[in-house]
Amino acid sequence: MRVMGIRMNYQHLWKWGIMLLGILMTCSVAEDLWVTVYYGVPVWKEATTTLFCASDAKSYEPEAHNIWATHACVPTDPNPREIEMENVTENFNMWKNNMVEQMHEDIISLWDQNLKPCVKLTPLCVTLNCTNAGGNKTTNGNNTTNQEEQMMEKGEMKNCSFNITTVISDKKKQVHALFYRLDVVPIDDDNSANTSNTNYTNYRLINCNTSAITQACPKVTFEPIPIHYCAPAGFAILKCKDKKFNGTGPCKKVSTVQCTHGIRPVVSTQLLLNGSLAEEEIIIRSENLTNNVKTIIVHLNESVEINCTRPDNKITRQSTPIGLGQALYTTRIKGDIRQAYCNISAAAWNKTLQQVAKKLGDLLNQTTIIFKPPAGGDPEITTHSFNCGGEFFYCNTSRLFNSTWNSSTWNNDTLNSEGTIKLPCRIKQIINMWQGVGKAMYAPPIEGLIKCTSNITGLLLTRDGGVNNSTNETFRPGGGDMKDNWRNELYKYKVVRIEPLGIAPTRAKRRVVEREKRAIGLGAVFLGFLGAAGSTMGAVSVALTGQARQLLSGIVQQQNNLLRAIEAQQHMLQLTVWGIKQLQARVLAVESYLKDQQLLGIWGCSGKHICTTTVPWNSSWSNKSLEEIWNNMTWIEWEREIDNYTGVIYSLIENSQIQQEKNEQDLLQLDKWASLWNWFSITKWLWYIKIFIMIVGGLIGLRIVFTVLSLVNRVRQGYSPLSFQTLLPAPRGPDRPEGIEEEGGEQGRDRSIRLVNGFSALFWDDLRNLCLFSYHRLRDLILIATRIVELLGRRGWEAIKYLWSLLQYWTQELKNSFISLLNATAIAVAEGTDRIIELIRRAFRAVLHIPRRVRQGLERALL
């Protein structure tokens, strides 16, 4: 009755409880998603890494010690692979490309390394007594179509004498040498003033007070050889194939390559030589076209040939000793000195400049484009400086950049330009090194005639500042920062790091923990399966095995090539820049492979392409449905969406695997009981224990809830408890008197227990009552379960006995019926047999009586 009263008082609570139970049951059957690890997915991230070089150095002269040291590179692949990536859009930025920085550092290191063993010209920082050597030219040479070789201006070369220390340190001797005027500067002192009336003037080398001068070794050549930059294993090079790509922004035509195309490290200013060409139209590239400080790179679509010549002035190289075991190689000229020059086709140049002007006018919305010579600066900037046959040319380009174009001229297809543009050039032997401040190089003279033919494939321009509302824009040739030269070739490349480990939600959950014996051969991918980067996640996941087979084999092949290149340098006292990079590439490949395998081992996924886990998928990472993820998204899109949570997911997988290994160890320790209780699964026992704990916890929770509800109900009825302690009725003993004399009627046997003071006593009393309550309920539950089992056993035994007796009865009935059937059959057969025998006997008798009947008939007839 008490229970029924509580149910009636809290009927609405029962309804809410039933509703809550239904909601929990509905949620419990909802679809659960689990984290699954995939190895070999086509995912990448932007990265910076050490690139190594590949070059076909065997096709060039083997005897020459080329400064680029391409003999130390790995051989180029005769069949380079390029994998198209469909449905992939990638962002490129040529102005923030680490490949440019790396190439710049490599070229600087190569120059420094090749010049390190060469002679230092510090002893030459002495006073030079110089006179003019040869050259009687008086014309200004402004005729742009005159191709005859012109004489060098008077004073262009100096015949200098100076004192040098001999092998014996306390003795000096005077020697003579020829220097170009650009390589020496006059000394303004008293001695020069005293000799002003003579033909001698005091000079010094131009770099003596600012730079350390090193003479290039005699056998060093500067002819550029194409260098291919290659990514190590675990990395890839993405290439933009958009023909109109300006170097920054998204590119929708992306492919992946192992190495770049052959890049010639041509060191030049104003004009870019022997590079690649734009495939369709001229491309203008600038970090900010409206900022006149930024350099503008013009990528031509058609090359313009430039032919440069230094006439044979009967130049010979003479060796001048400047110290113990050191020699200065100077120039000796017999006869007149003719000037170096370069020739460019006027028609080809004007056509190119016309297209450049039109392109600049369209981009800047200007009606007039003006080209002017440089305003001033170092000779390397004001002239077109480059290396030709070992000599460093400085050519005046004022005849190339001295024109004005407007909408009427740049749209004119019939330009009157004939003949050849001739650029006067000067030669320097003391070169300001472009690698940095404070370095200079002395280039020994080259004997004989020098000719070189190059292709102009780009321009370096700067824009003049001024009034913004002007309709005219003035551009001048520039350069000097060699990074711009490399950018014009590397604008379409970027290096990415392959992330072969992918995580995604699936319905599969790891059920059985198995220890793998060994890991399969999976390495860091560098090319191969990136062709599937544009496919959906579901399409890629079914082909992971085939994709992963290429990985380790690619690493091994690349490692062998690098090792052969390193072994080829063992005869050298030190490795070149390329050798160091090859060693770094080998280390990077191994590190990348071991890192991935370590993660797979920590997660318990060694040797698996697809590995399920016990980590539930959290919708806060991504709330997309499975169908939307696997059917509509690519792996790279998915990776970018969950990139912020990969670290958290990795740690959860690791912690889950650690816990799983602990559980496995515990299970192995309990496995000895399986022989005794093999009809039960150990995991089931753990499940039973969990259910038992849940039931006990539920009972305790219900006890607390009902206690609180009872207290609230009494408060609502006007009863205020003395304390937070709930007073439970305690039954009186049978030997205690009940009530007092004044009380009448039947009294109950309940009384209130005493109150306790203090928090500890109150807590202990409540805890004891709660434990007693749980014990009593559990005891009642066990008794009820025992009675149920006993009742079910008794009823079951009675049912079995009834079924057994019923079986015996029906068996007996079937036996009797079968016997009766046999008896009836036997009787029927016997009776039928008797009748047949009787009929046969009667028939036989009838046959036997036929003669008698015939005789009797005849007798009657005769009577």
Curated annotation (Swiss-Prot):
Disulfide bonds join 53-73, 118-217, 125-208, 130-160, 230-259, 240-251, 308-342, 388-452, 395-425, 605-611. A lipid is attached at residue 771 (S-palmitoyl cysteine). Residues 729-748 are annotated as: Disordered. Residues 640-674 form a coiled coil. Residues 130-159 are annotated as: V1. InterPro entries: Gp120_core_sf, Gp160, GP41-like, HIV1_Gp120. It comes from the Viruses. One of its GO terms (molecular function) is structural molecule activity. Residues 519-539 are annotated as: Fusion peptide. GO terms for biological process: clathrin-dependent endocytosis of virus by host cell; fusion of virus membrane with host endosome membrane; fusion of virus membrane with host plasma membrane; positive regulation of plasma membrane raft polarization; positive regulation of receptor clustering; viral protein processing; virion attachment to host cell. The chain crosses the membrane at residues 692-712. Residues 713-863 are cytoplasmic. Residues 1-31 form the signal peptide. Residues 374-384 are annotated as: CD4-binding loop. Inhibitors targeting HIV-1 viral envelope proteins are used as antiretroviral drugs. Attachment of virions to the cell surface via non-specific interactions and CD4 binding can be blocked by inhibitors that include cyanovirin-N, cyclotriazadisulfonamide analogs, PRO 2000, TNX 355 and PRO 542. In addition, BMS 806 can block CD4-induced conformational changes. Env interactions with the coreceptor molecules can be targeted by CCR5 antagonists including SCH-D, maraviroc (UK 427857) and aplaviroc (GW 873140), and the CXCR4 antagonist AMD 070. HIV-1 lineages are divided in three main groups, M (for Major), O (for Outlier), and N (for New, or Non-M, Non-O). The vast majority of strains found worldwide belong to the group M. Group O seems to be endemic to and largely confined to Cameroon and neighboring countries in West Central Africa, where these viruses represent a small minority of HIV-1 strains. The group N is represented by a limited number of isolates from Cameroonian persons. The group M is further subdivided in 9 clades or subtypes (A to D, F to H, J and K). Belongs to the HIV-1 env protein family. This is Envelope glycoprotein gp160. The gene is env.
